[in-house]
């Protein structure tokens, strides 16, 4: 039982490091939205408009 405890901690630390490095490079967001097309200013939502738009409703 004492043998598996350090391996579990090492696996947990490695998982956290991979998630942090993927978040820094921005691959996590792209990986989750591969099938969606990015619309204006790289936003995956359909009804998203830029802030400088004059139209009050999309």
UniProtKB/Swiss-Prot annotation:
Signal peptide (UniProt feature, chain positions): 1-22
Q: Which domain of life is it from?
A: Eukaryota
- Tell me the subunit arrangement: Interacts with aplnra and aplnrb.
| Main function | Peptide hormone that functions as endogenous ligand for the G-protein-coupled apelin receptor (aplnra and/or aplnrb), that plays a role in the regulation of normal cardiovascular function and fluid homeostasis. Functions as a balanced agonist activating both G(i) protein pathway and beta-arrestin pathway of APLNR. Downstream G proteins activation, apelin can inhibit cAMP production and activate key intracellular effectors such as ERKs. On the other hand, APLNR activation induces beta-arrestin recruitment to the membrane leading to desensitization and internalization of the receptor.
Which family, according to UniProt? Belongs to the Elabela/Toddler family.
- Which organism does this record belong to? Danio rerio (Zebrafish)
Protein name, please?
A: Apelin receptor early endogenous ligand
Task: List the top taxonomic levels of the source.
Answer: Eukaryota, Metazoa, Chordata, Craniata, Vertebrata
What is the tissue specificity? Expressed ubiquitously during late blastula and gastrula stages and becomes restricted to the lateral mesoderm, endoderm, and anterior and posterior notochord after gastrulation.
What do mutants without this gene show?
Zinc-finger-nuclease (ZFN)- or TALEN-mediated apela gene inactivation induces embryonic lethality due to heart dysgenesis around 6 days post-fertilization (dpf). Mutant embryos show cardiac dysplasia ranging from a rudimentary heart to no heart. Embryos have minimal blood circulation, with an excess of erythrocytes accumulating at the intermediate cell mass (ICM). Larvae display variable posterior truncations and, at times, tailbud duplications. Posterior tissue defects range from loss of the ventral fin to complete tail and trunk truncations.
Task: Please state the gene responsible for encoding this protein.
Answer: apela
Recorded GO molecular functions are: apelin receptor binding; hormone activity; receptor ligand activity
- One Gene Ontology term, aspect cellular component: extracellular space
């Amino acid at each position: 039982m004492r043998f598996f405890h350090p391996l579990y901690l090492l696996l947990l630390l490695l998982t956290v490091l991979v998630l942090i490095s993927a978040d820094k490079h921005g691959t996590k967001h792209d990986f989750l939205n591969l099938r969606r097309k990015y619309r204006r200013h790289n936003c995956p939502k359909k009804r998203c408009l830029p802030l400088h738009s004059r139209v009050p409703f999309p």
